Structure formats: structure tokens, C-alpha cells
Amino acid sequence: MVVYDLLISGGYLVDPVNSLEGRFDVAIEGGKVVRVEAEISRHLARQVYEAKGYMVLPGLIDTHVHLTPAMRAAGFHMLAAAGVTTALDCAGPVETVLEGMALNGSGINIAVLNRLTPGGSLSSEHAPKDEVRSYIKKSLADGALGIKLIGGHLPLSPETTIAAIEAANEAGCYAAFHCGSTQNGSNLHGFLDALEFAGNNHLQICHVNAYCRGLTHGSPAEETLLALKELAARPHLVSESHMGPLNSCWSRLNENGIPFSHVTRTCLTSGGYSMDRKGLLAATLDGYMQVQRAWPANVVYLEPEEGAAYLKEVDFETMVSFPVNERSTAYLCATAKNPEGGFIVNALSTDGGAIPRNFLLSHGLALVRFDALSTAQFVQKTSGTPAHMLGLSNKGHLKPGADADLVVVDAERHIPLLTVASGQIIMAGGAVMGRGGKLVTTDFGVNSLTDQNVDHEVANLEQGLFYKAPGGLSRMAG
């Protein structure tokens, strides 16, 4: 008699949330894990995946990705191909993410943070708190999980930045911060400002490694140790870091012919290039700057000559990358612990998605091979803790009753072989066959998403690590 939709047979399961590690079979029915036992009869399943010799992990949860604009919707497939089953889009807007999901969804779960942009979603860098509140209210009603401050790229004043963090906490939503303001940019000073701006409010500090490039103290390692010390003193803040050697920023130019993004400006000047068309083209031709091009199925880096030609073709309206992320900084942020033995930076992320650096498995398992992390710690930082951050208690583990989100991994080659989301195979052998997806939202977004027939689930942020992390406000202010 057939009982289960799918059986993952013979794999080596690593599930630190439930203290399970060893050879187990996993039975899936109706989008849920229903049995985890040493041996389950293959005859009970409609479909069997033989995982002998491979690892079976809870689906990866990436707490920092980018999936917009819709022309970069290939990011949905890129995530599924990398073993990711849930991701936090850190820009939005939610309507554009939904457009991309409809065009090229891969069956994964997506939460969205709508970004605060001076001259865009906000009137200016000095927007008053009431205006920020109004934008947050609209964003949540549209289905967003919260907001993203992008002060490193497009800074707000310190006053508006503080107001936004406070308003998000008052609304009980999620908030993340690419550190920087009109006071200090995307560097260690901007990072330290962000910690002060947050006060006792709750906040996700994005890509901690990105503020430690030697711009303020000359030594990336010294800056990283200082950043980790200050972050460890504020356990109420959640954080993530990534391991990609390249950053990502816009090459778009403003009316004065200067890059919109302050990060792009800094990278150009740090490399000895001018902050204009000439500098962008020269940096590309020299191989210092790599130009990204989005195709329907992928986003790729172009060779120098091709990249320069593409910049001209699209009038610099694309994304570019610079080799500014130090390996020492990536290592320290991924592995550093506090005196109690917990990780200072909660999660490993990629800042990937539609940016070609979805390195959770490839680089994360390299840390395992290096004995810098155990496999269980890797799973903790890429699935268990991220699920807790986002208030998704049925994800990040594979206990019976949990959502059937998992990945089968070739640990020797550091690659995913099978990605399963909500009990459906969405990637096998590198081929993505998943479609659509599910939006992770708050109670405020349910009506709008229901009216649009968008599949969704509500995160329990109040019980998640974002609001339960020790040391901050004891409850949401709203």
C-alpha cells in the first residue's frame, strides 16, 4: 500500500535542531515530513530517492538575497539550484518579487523586505517618521515581511534612519540594515553608527563582513575583530555574513554622471578610478570591475571587452562587482564565537539570488572540510538559526510535522543533488523543475495576497529570534 509521496532513502541526515545525525530515511506526505527512521520500506512510497553516500540536510535558508528587478527573475532558479528552499529578499518591492515569481518561480519560499530609498519610496534622506510609518504600513499590507535600509548605497540621515528602525519595531515587522547613513558610509564607522542607531530595538545587521575592508583602520582583520567585539555586546541584534569574494552594486549614473550607489563610488576610488563613465569603463577593461548580465535562466559575469560593450549598450543600467571582500574577514565572521560558545554572527548568507554568488554549500562546506565548522554547525548557520530568525518554526529542521524542505548534498563535491520544497522536488541533478512559490508574510499581508491568489504563509515574528533575541526590548512596542 502506498502511503508516502516521497521517500529519501539511505542518506546521512544532519539535523542539529533535533539532535539527529546519522543514517535515516525521511518520508514525506502532503508537503510535510511524516517519518524519520533508520529504515522505512521503499514499497510505501510513490517515489524513492536513493541518497546513500550523500548528506540529507534541512533546506537551506538564505537570509540575504536579491531577486529584483523582474528581469533578474533567474534568481529564483539560481537559488533552487543551490539548494535553497527559503530566502529573504532584501530590497523588494514585494510586487516586483511577485511578478518575478509568476514569470520564473522555482517553488521556493520568499520573504520580502521593501527598501527605503530617498527620492523613491521616501521623499528625501530627511523624511519624517510619519512618512516612514506610512510606507511601512503600505509595505506590510502589500505582503512584505518588513523593511530594508540601504544606507550603504543610498543613505538616509541619522535621524530618519533611527526613525525607520523605531517605526519597524513599533509595527512588529522585520527590519534589516546595510549599514551607512549621511554621517558615515558602508565601512566600520557606518557599522558602529548602526549599532548605536538601533539602541535597544531589534534589527538585522546585513553582511557584517562588508564593513571590514580596511577603509577606516587599514587592516580588514583588525576592523573585523573590532566589529565582532561590538556586535557580541549586543545580542539582541541578529546578523549574517557571506563568503563571496566579489561585492555587488549598481553602475547606474545620476544626473551628474556619478554612480548612484555610494558603494560603487568607494570601490572605484579605492581602485584608482574616477567616479564616472570613463572610470567604470576603465575598471571593466582592466578586469577590476566585473559586469553582470541577466539572462532568462541565469545571471553571469561578462569578460572585460564584452562587459564594457554591455555597459554602453544599456547606458550603465546594470549591476557590477568588485573584488573587495577579504577572505580573512569572511572566515572570522563565519566562525567567531562569544564567550558562551555561541556564534557572534548568527547566520551564513550569500547576498546572492540573482547575483552569481550562491555559495552557501560550496563555501560553507569548505569551512567544514577545513574543520572551522562542524557539519551540524554549518546546518545551524544556514538553516536552523535562519528559520528561527524569520519566525518559521516548521522550517530549519526535519522533525515529523515539519515542512518538507530539504536538500541532498554531495559533501565531497560541495554541491546539491536534490532540492525539495513543500514536499515537491524542485531541483534534481542541477535541473530546476519547480514552479511558482510561496510568499512569507505577516498578518497584515494576508488579505492582499489572498485577493491575488498568491500562496503564502504567515511568519511568527513575535516568537522568532528577531524579537526574542536577548537584551533588547522585551516585547514589540506596537
Map each language-model feature to its residues.
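Active-site microenvironment of metallo-dependent hydrolases
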Residues: 1-24, 28-29, 38-39, 79-80, ...
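Divalent metal-coordination and catalytic microenvironments
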Residues: 11, 31, 53, 64, ...
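Hydrophobic faces of well-ordered beta-strands that scaffold small-molecule active sites
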Residues: 59-65, 87-89, 110-114, 147-149, ...
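Divalent-metal coordination cores built from histidine and acidic residues
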Residues: 73-154, 166-173
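Anion (oxyanion) recognition and catalysis
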Residues: 80, 104, 169, 199, ...
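Active-site neighborhoods of metal-dependent hydrolases
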Residues: 145, 217-366, 474-478
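Functional cores that coordinate and move charged inorganic groups
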Residues: 151-232, 239, 247-249
